[in-house]
Amino acid sequence: DKVLYLYRLLPIPFRTICQMLYEHAHFDSYGVGENLITSASDPVFGGVYKLVAVKKPDGSYTPKMKCSDSASKAIIPGKKMPWRLYDENGQAQCDLIAMDGEVIEAGKPVTMVNLDSDAIERTITFTPTAVRPLLVPHIVGGKLAIELPSIAEKKAYIAKQLTEETWESELRLECPHKHYVNMTPAVAECRSRMYAELHGGKV
């Protein structure tokens, strides 16, 4: 028996592909073209390094904050550790920015402050059944500090990230839901205090 494969070629925007799939188009493959290689929807990755702390001779850190006229752009000062908090089903509920050295434990209530100053509920409490630190040193003293994963392990890790670490609503192409990122009261206090010292206002 002969098998006929149907391909839809030429550059296709992702919205067009979504519409074709919704209409049950019978194509085996799509030629996305330069819409994929140029990341047409988000062609620029906005990543900027900013100084948040200075290490002192005794090994401790002094928090630093860049001056900004906009409270919404105020960076989070200090040496920090981000955590991921999970519910009883093993689903990630949110990420939490804590000061380095703060202890976040599973089974104990965690008070969190919403990064959005306009949020209806600025402070919430959640008891995670599991927690995981997200900042893992890969290079220490100029040397590799971890065992590099295999390609199969990388694929399994990404698959787990998409199924257990991310909500379905965060993956949709149109109006995706924001991933919740909160901060501990200690982080919020440090940020507000330093912003007030620099600008005389609240954040």
Feature locations, PLM:
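Acidic, glycine-rich loop-and-beta core segments that form the ion-binding/anion-interacting portion
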Residues: 1-7, 16
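Gly/Ser/Thr/Ala-enriched C-terminal appendages of enzymes
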Residues: 12-203
